[in-house]
Swiss-Prot record:
Free-text note on domains in this protein's UniProt record: Contains a well-conserved 23 amino acid extended signal peptide region (ESPR) preceding a typical N-terminal signal sequence. ESPR region may be involved in regulating the translocation of the autotransporter across the inner membrane into the periplasm. The signal peptide, cleaved at the inner membrane, guides the autotransporter protein to the periplasmic space. Then, insertion of the C-terminal translocator domain in the outer membrane forms a hydrophilic pore for the translocation of the passenger domain to the bacterial cell surface.
A single cellular component GO annotation: cell surface
Residues annotated as transmembrane: none
Identification of the protein by name: Autotransporter adhesin BpaC
Compartment(s): Cell surface; Cell outer membrane
GO biological process, alphabetically ordered: cell adhesion; protein transport
Function per UniProt: Involved in virulence. Mediates adherence to human respiratory epithelial cells.
Keywords: Cell adhesion, Cell outer membrane, Membrane, Protein transport, Signal, Transmembrane, Transmembrane beta strand, Transport, Virulence
Outcome of gene disruption: Lafontaine et al. show that disruption of the gene reduces adherence to cultures of normal human bronchial epithelium (NHBE) but does not impair binding to HEp-2 laryngeal cells and A549 type II pneumocytes. In contrast, Campos et al. show that disruption of the gene decreases adherence to A549 cells and attenuates the ability of the bacteria to invade A549 cells. Mutant does not show a plaque formation defect. Mutation reduces the ability to disseminate and/or survive within the liver in a mouse model of infection. Mutation does not affect the virulence in a mouse model of aerosol infection.
Segments of this protein annotated with the region Outer membrane translocation of the passenger domain: 1062-1099
Surface exposed passenger domain: annotated segments: 72-1061
Gene transcribed to yield this protein: bpaC
Length: 1152
C-alpha cells in the first residue's frame, strides 16, 4: 500500500513533524516533501550514531519495560494511530516495527503520533501526543548532565522556582535569599546594638559594687548600698597614692598636700616674723654702739623693738600653735573619721553628685566620720592636690617641734644678748679696730671691716662679721655668731646658740653645742652636728655627716651621701638612704626605713612599719615585724616574712621562703621555688606550686591547689574546690570533695573520683577507676581499662567499653552502649538506642528497644530483634531469628537459616530464602521473591513483580501477577501464567499450560505439550507445534520462496520489491526527514547533555549537576539530580534544553 506524507508545523511541540497527506497545519505552514532512500539512510545512521553515544555514556536509569534484543538499531514512525514503517538493522526489526518493548510503554497503533529511535537497548522516543521526549539506556553510568560550549558553560534559562529539597533554584530565589539574609543580618545587628545599650544601662545602674556610676545622674558611688565603714586602698605592694583630691572643707573631708603645704607656709611665715623681730633687735643694738650718748634711748628703743619682736614672735608662735592646734584638730577629726572604717569589699569611694566635685567617705549625706587608711605619701608642692598621710603630718609635727625648740633657744640667746647689752650700757670697754667696726662688751674685739662684736670677750675678725654673746667669735667673712661661746668661722656662716659652731662656708648652726662644719651645712638643735657638704641636722644630738644628708630628730644620724634620717634615734648610713621613724635604720644604698625600729639594710631596700626589716637587695618589708631578707623580696603584713630571692609575702604571719615565691594571706607559706600561696593557712611547698584558698596545700612540683582545704600533692597536679585532692602525678581534681589519685587522672565534679592512671571523672559522684577510663555524668562509673561512661548513672565496667546515656551499661569487653537504659553485655557488642540490648558477642542493637542476642547479630530499628547467630534485623519490629538471617523493613521477618526478608511485612521462612518487597513471602527453601505481595512457596522458586507467585519447585515468575505454578516453570510478563511442568510464558497475559510448552508474546497461549507460541495472540494448542499467530491472525515468515497463498511466507525478492515501493513513497518525505534529523540532532545533544551529569557517589545521598553536549552543531544544556533513597533504591531525573525543545527524563532502579 502506497502512502504520501508531508511535513507540518506542530504548535504544541514547536517542531516540523511528518503527517498524513490529508493533515492540515494550523497557520498553513505545511509543506509536501519527497523523501529519498539516501535521506532516510542518513537519518538512520545519525540516529544510530547518537543512540550508540547514549549507550556509551548512560542516560536515565532503566525502566520496567521489556528490553529489545541486542545488536539492533532502527527507527519507528507512528502517526494517526498506525505504524508507518520501519527501517532497521538486525533481527528485531527484520519483520517491521515492533509494537512492544519501547520506553515508557509506547505501543504501536496505540499512540497518535510518535517517533522512536533505538540502538540495542538504548532508545529515544518523541511522543507528539503527550508533548514529551523519553530516554532509556541499557548502560549504568548515564548519570552526568554537562552543559558547555567552546568557551565554557551555557546559560540555562526559563527555570521554574524549586519547591522540593532536591529541586534546582533560580536567580529569583537566590536574590530573595540574599535579601532575606541581609534583612536578618540587619535585624541581628539592631537587636545586638539594643542588647549592648541595655547592658550598658544595667551596668551603670548597679547599686552595689566596687565602683558604680548612676546611669541617669553620672554620680559615682563606692559600695553605696553596703553597710561597711572601711575603705582600704592597700595593694599587694603596699599603700597607694590617692590623687585628684579636692581641698577639704568640712570637718570630715580629706585634706590634700596643697593644704598641708599651705600650713607649712603659714608656719614658715610665723618663723620669718620672729626672725624679723630678732633682726630688728640686732639693728637697734648696733645703733646703740654707734652713739653712747643716745645709748639709753636707743637701748630703750631696741628693747622696745625687741619686745615688739618678741611679742610678734610670740604672736607668730601662738598663730603657729593655733595652726598646729587647728591641724591637730583636723587630724583628730580625720583620725576620728578614719577610725570608724571597717574593711569591706563592697564599700568603695564614690562621687557625691554628677559634678564630681566632692567625695564623702561613707556615701553622700553621711555625717558619721570614717577612717581613711593606707594612703600613700602625697606630693608636697604648691600646686599639688595629693592627699597626705599621718606619716607626713608626723614629720611636719617633728619639724615644727624642732623649729620651736630652735626659736626657744634663739629667744634664750636673745635674752642673754639683751642682758649683755644692758651690762654694756653701764660700761663699754671693747676694741673696734676694723673700718666701720663696732665692739661692745668687756674685751670685745671687732677687727674686720664693717664687723660687729657684741658681748664680753666677743670677737668679730671677719669682714662684715657679727659676734654677739659672751666669748662669741665670728672670723669668717660675712659670718654671724650669736650666743655664748658661739663660733662662726666659715665664710657666710651663722652660729646661733651657746657653744654653737659654724665652720663650713655658708653653714648654719642653731642651738646649744650645735655644729655645722660642712660647706652649706645646717645644724639645728642642741648638740646637733652637720659635717657633710650641704648636710642638714635638725634635732637634739642629730648628726648629718654625709654630703647632702639630712638628719631630723633627737639622736637622728644621716651619714650616707644624700641620706635622710627622720625621727628619734633614726639612722641613715647608706648612700641615698632614708630612715623615717624612731630608731629606724637605713644602711643600704638607696634604702628606705619607715617606722619605729624599722631596718632597711639591703641595697635599694624598703622597710615600712614597726620592727620591719628589709635586708635583701631591692627588698621591701611593709608591716609590723615584717621581714624581707631575700633579694628583690617583698613582705607586707604583720610578721610577714619574705626570705627567698624575688619572693613576696603578703598578710599576717605570711612566709615566702622559696625563690620567686609568693605568699598572700594570714599564715600563708610559699617555700617552693616559684611557688604561690594565697589564703589563710595556704601552703605551697612544691617547686612552681600554687595554693589558693584557706588551708589549701600544694606540695607537688608544678602543682596547683585552689579551694578551701584543697590538696595537690602530685607533681604537675591541680586541685580546685573545697576539700579537692589531686595526689597523682599530672592529676586534676575540680569540685567539692573531688579526688584524682591516678597518674594523669582528672576528677571534675562534687565527690568525683579518678583513681585509674590517665582516668577522667566528670560529674557529681562520677567515678573513673580503670586505667585510661572516662566517666562523665552524675553517678557515672568507668571501672574497666580504657572504658568510657557518659551519662547519669552510666556504667562501663568492661575493658575498652563505652556507655553513653542515662543508666547506660557497657559490661562486655570492647562493648558500646548508647542511649537511656541501653545495655551492651556481650564482648565487642554495641547497643545504640533507648532500652536497646546487645548481649551476644560482636552483636549490634540500634534503636529503641532493639535487641541483638545472637552472636555476631545486628538489630536496627525500634523493637527490632536479631536472635540468630550472624543474623541482621533492620526496621521497626523486624525479626531475624534464623542463623545468618537478614530482615529489612518494618515488621519484616527472616526466620529461616540464611533467610533474607526485605520490605515492610516481608517474610522469609524457608532456609536460605529471600523475600523482597512489601508483604512478600518466601517460604520455600532457597526461594526468592521481589515485589509487593509476591510469593515464592516452591523450593528454589523465584517470584519477581507485584503479586507474582512461584509455587512450583524451581519455578520463576517475573512480572506483575505473573504465576509459575508448574515445577521448573517460567512466567515472564504482567499476568503471565506458566502452569505446565517446565513450561515458559513470556509476555503480558501469556499462558503456557502444557508440559514443556513455551508462549512468547502478549496474550500468546501454548496449551499443547512441548508446543511453542510466538508473537502477540499466537496460539499453540497442539502438542509439539510452533505457532506464530492464530486463526484469523496469521503472520508471514521471511527468507523463503515466494509466497503464493494468503498464509504463505514471502521471499527476498518479494521483500525487495516491497522496500522499493517504500523508498518511492519516502522520496517525498525528504524535507520532513531533514526536519526530523534536525530535531533528532537536538534530541541527541539534549540526551547526551543529560548523560554528562555525574551520578551520586557511594556513601552520598544526593547529587545535583548540569551538563552540556553538542551533536553536529546542535548545542544542548541539561540539569539533573540523582538521589539514593535507600541502600538498594536509587532515583534519577533530569531535564535538557536544545533549541526550542525540552527533554526530560526520570528513572528508578532497585538493586540487590
Amino acid at each position: 500500500m502506497n502512502r504520501i506524507f508531508k511535513s507540518i508545523w506542530c504548535e504544541q511541540t514547536r517542531t516540523w513533524v511528518a503527517a498524513s497527506e490529508h493533515a492540515v497545519a494550523r497557520g498553513g505552514r505545511a509543506s509536501s516533501v519527497v523523501a529519498s532512500a539516501g535521506g532516510l539512510e542518513k537519518v538512520l545512521k545519525l540516529s544510530i550514531l547518537g543512540a550508540a553515544s547514549l549507550i556509551a555514556m548512560g542516560v536515565v536509569g532503566p525502566f520496567a519495560e521489556e528490553a529489545m534484543a541486542a545488536n539492533n538499531a532502527g527507527v519507528c514512525l507512528t502517526y494517526n494511530g498506525s505504524s508507518n514503517n520501519t527501517s532497521g538493522t538486525g533481527g528485531w526489526f527484520a519483520d517491521g516495527c515492533k509494537s512492544a518493548g519501547w520506553v515508557q510503554g509506547m505501543v504501536t497503533n496505540s499512540k497518535t503520533d510518535w517517533v522512536g529511535l533505538t540502538a540495542d537497548d538504548t532508545q529515544i522516543v518523541l511522543d507528539g501526543s503527550a508533548g514529551s521526549i523519553y530516554f532509556r539506556t541499557g548502560g549504568i553510568n548515564g548519570n552526568v548532565l554537562t552543559m558547555s560550549n567552546a568557551t565554557g558553560g551555557v546559560l540555562l534559562s526559563g527555570l521554574a522556582a524549586g519547591v522540593n529539597p532536591t529541586d534546582a533554584v533560580n536567580m529569583s530565589q537566590l536574590t530573595s535569599l540574599s535579601t532575606s539574609t541581609a534583612t536578618g543580618i540587619t535585624s541581628l545587628s539592631t537587636s545586638t546594638a539594643t542588647s549592648i545599650a541595655s547592658l550598658s544601662t544595667s551596668m551603670l545602674s548597679l547599686g552595689v559594687g566596687v565602683v558604680t556610676q548612676d546611669a541617669s545622674t553620672g554620680a559615682i558611688s563606692v559600695g553605696a548600698n553596703s553597710p561597711g565603714l572601711t575603705v582600704d586602698f592597700a595593694g599587694g605592694q603596699g599603700p597607694r597614692t590617692l590623687t585628684g583630691v579636692a581641698a577639704g572643707v568640712n570637718a570630715t573631708d580629706a585634706v590634700n598636700v596643697g593644704q598641708l603645704a599651705s600650713l607649712s607656709t603659714s608656719t614658715a611665715a610665723g618663723l620669718s616674723t620672729a626672725a624679723s623681730g630678732v633682726a630688728s633687735l640686732s639693728t637697734s643694738l648696733l645703733g646703740a654702739v654707734g652713739d653712747l650718748a643716745s645709748l639709753s634711748t636707743s637701748a630703750s628703743t631696741g628693747l622696745a623693738t625687741a619686745d615688739s619682736g618678741i611679742a610678734s614672735l610670740s604672736t607668730s608662735l601662738l598663730g603657729t600653735a593655733d595652726n598646729v592646734t587647728s591641724l591637730s584638730t583636723s587630724l583628730s577629726t580625720v583620725n576620728a573619721n578614719l577610725a570608724g572604717l571597717q574593711t569591706s569589699v563592697d564599700n568603695v569611694v564614690s562621687y557625691d553628685d554628677p559634678s564630681k566635685s566632692a567625695i564623702t567617705l561613707g556615701g553622700a549625706g553621711v555625717t558619721t566620720p570614717v577612717l581613711l587608711t593606707n594612703v600613700a605619701a602625697g606630693k608636697i608642692a604648691a600646686t599639688s592636690t595629693d592627699a597626705v598621710n599621718g606619716s607626713q603630718l608626723y614629720t611636719l609635727q617633728q619639724e615644727f617641734s624642732q623649729q620651736y625648740d630652735l626659736l626657744t633657744s634663739q629667744v634664750s640667746s636673745l635674752s642673754t644678748s639683751v642682758s649683755g647689752l644692758q651690762g654694756s650700757v653701764s660700761a663699754n670697754t671693747g676694741t673696734a679696730s676694723g673700718d666701720n667696726s663696732t665692739a661692745s662688751g668687756d674685751n670685745a674685739t671687732a677687727s674686720g671691716t664693717n664687723s660687729t662684736a657684741n658681748g664680753t670677750n666677743s670677737t668679730a675678725s671677719g669682714d662684715n662679721s657679727t659676734a654677739s654673746g659672751t666669748n662669741a667669735s665670728a672670723s669668717g667673712e660675712n659670718s654671724t655668731a650669736t650666743g655664748t661661746d658661739s663660733t662662726a668661722s666659715g665664710s657666710n656662716s651663722t652660729a646661733n646658740g651657746t657653744n654653737s659652731t659654724a665652720s663650713g662656708d655658708n653653714s648654719t648652726a642653731s642651738g646649744t653645742n650645735a655644729s655645722a662644719t660642712g660647706e652649706n651645712s645646717t645644724a639645728t638643735g642642741t648638740d646637733s652636728t652637720a659635717s657633710g657638704s650641704n648636710s642638714t641636722a635638725n634635732g637634739t644630738n642629730s648628726t648629718a655627716s654625709g654630703d647632702n644628708s639630712t638628719a631630723s630628730g633627737t639622736n637622728a644620724s644621716a651619714s650616707g651621701e644624700n641620706s635622710t634620717a627622720t625621727g628619734t634615734d633614726s639612722t641613715a648610713s647608706g648612700s641615698n638612704s632614708t630612715a623615717n621613724g624612731t630608731n629606724s635604720t637605713a644602711s643600704g644604698d638607696n634604702s628606705t626605713a619607715s617606722g619605729t625600729n624599722a631596718s632597711a639594710t639591703g641595697e635599694n631596700s624598703t622597710a615600712t612599719g614597726t620592727d620591719s626589716t628589709a635586708s635583701g637587695s631591692n627588698s621591701t618589708a611593709n608591716g609590723t615585724n615584717s621581714t624581707a631578707s631575700g633579694d628583690n623580696s617583698t613582705a607586707s603584713g604583720t610578721n610577714a616574712s619574705a626570705t627567698g630571692e624575688n619572693s613576696t609575702a603578703t598578710g599576717t604571719d605570711s612566709t615566702a621562703s622559696g625563690s620567686n615565691s609568693t605568699a598572700n594571706g594570714t599564715n600563708s607559706t610559699a617555700s617552693g621555688d616559684n611557688s604561690t600561696a594565697s589564703g589563710t593557712n595556704a601552703s605551697a611547698t612544691g617547686e612552681n606550686s600554687t595554693a589558693t584558698g584557706t588551708d589549701s596545700t600544694a606540695s607537688g612540683s608544678n602543682s596547683t591547689a585552689n579551694g578551701t582545704n584543697s590538696t595537690a600533692s602530685g607533681d604537675n597536679s591541680t586541685a580546685s574546690g573545697t576539700n579537692a585532692s589531686a595526689t597523682g602525678e599530672n592529676s586534676t581534681a575540680t569540685g567539692t570533695d573531688s579526688t584524682a589519685s591516678g597518674s594523669n587522672s582528672t576528677a571534675n565534679g562534687a565527690n568525683s573520683t579518678a583513681s585509674g592512671d590517665n582516668s577522667t571523672a566528670s560529674g557529681t559522684n562520677a567515678s573513673a577507676t580503670g586505667e585510661n577510663s572516662t566517666a562523665t555524668g552524675t553517678d557515672s562509673t568507668a571501672s574497666g581499662s580504657n572504658s568510657t561512661a557518659n551519662g547519669t548513672n552510666s556504667t562501663a565496667s568492661g575493658n575498652n567499653s563505652t556507655a553513653s546515656g542515662t543508666n547506660a551499661s557497657a559490661t562486655g569487653e570492647n562493648s558500646t552502649a548508647t542511649g537511656t537504659d541501653s545495655a551492651a553485655s556481650g564482648t565487642n557488642s554495641t547497643a545504640n538506642g533507648t532500652n536497646s540490648t546487645a548481649s551476644g558477642d560482636n552483636s549490634t542493637a540500634s534503636g529503641t528497644n532493639a535487641s541483638a542476642t545472637g552472636e555476631n547479630s545486628t538489630a536496627t530499628g525500634t523493637a527490632s530483634t536479631a536472635s540468630g547467630s550472624n543474623s541482621t534485623a533492620n526496621g521497626a519490629n523486624s525479626t531475624a531469628s534464623g542463623a545468618g538471617a537478614t530482615a529489612t523493613g518494618e515488621n519484616a521477618a527472616a526466620t529461616g537459616a540464611g533467610a533474607t526478608a526485605t520490605g515492610n511485612n516481608a517474610s522469609a521462612s524457608g532456609t536460605s530464602s529471600t523475600a523482597g518487597g512489601a508483604n512478600a513471602i518466601a517460604s520455600g527453601e532457597n526461594s526468592t521473591t521481589n515485589g509487593a505481595n509476591s510469593t515464592a512457596s516452591g523450593n528454589g522458586s523465584s517470584a519477581f513483580g507485584e503479586s507474582a507467585a512461584a509455587a512450583g519447585d524451581g519455578s520463576t515468575a517475573l512480572g506483575a501477577n505473573a504465576v509459575a505454578s508448574g515445577v521448573g516453570s517460567v512466567a515472564t510478563g504482567a499476568g503471565s501464567v506458566a502452569s505446565g511442568a517446565n513450561s515458559s510464558a513470556y509476555g503480558t497475559g501469556s499462558n503456557a499450560t502444557g508440559a514443556g510448552s513455551v508462549a512468547i508474546g502478549q496474550g500468546a497461549t501454548a496449551s499443547g505439550s512441548n508446543s511453542v507460541a510466538l508473537g502477540t495472540g499466537s496460539v499453540a494448542s497442539e502438542d509439539n507445534t510452533v505457532s506464530v499467530g492464530s486463526a484469523g491472525s496469521e503472520r508471514r515468515i521471511t527468507n523463503v520462496a515466494a509466497g503464493v497463498n494468503a498464509t504463505d511466507a514471502v521471499n527476498v525478492g518479494q521483500l525487495n520489491s516491497a522496500v522499493s515501493g517504500i523508498r518511492n513513497q519516502m522520496d517525498g518525505m525528504q524535507g520532513q526527514i531533514d526536519t526530523l534529523a534536525r530535531d533528532a540532532y537536538s534530541g541527541i545533544a539534549a540526551a547526551t547533555a543529560l548523560t554528562m551529569i555525574p551520578d551520586v557517589d557511594p556513601g552520598k545521598t544526593l547529587a545535583v549537576g548540569i551538563g552540556t553536549a553538542n551533536f553536529k552543531g546542535y548545542q544542548a544544556s541539561a540539569l539533573g539530580a540523582t538521589a539514593r533513597i535507600t541502600q538498594n533504591l536509587k532515583v534519577k531525573t533530569g531535564v535538557s534544553y536544545s533549541g526550542s525543545n525540552y527533554v526530560w527524563g526520570a528513572g528508578m532502579s532497585y538493586q540487590w
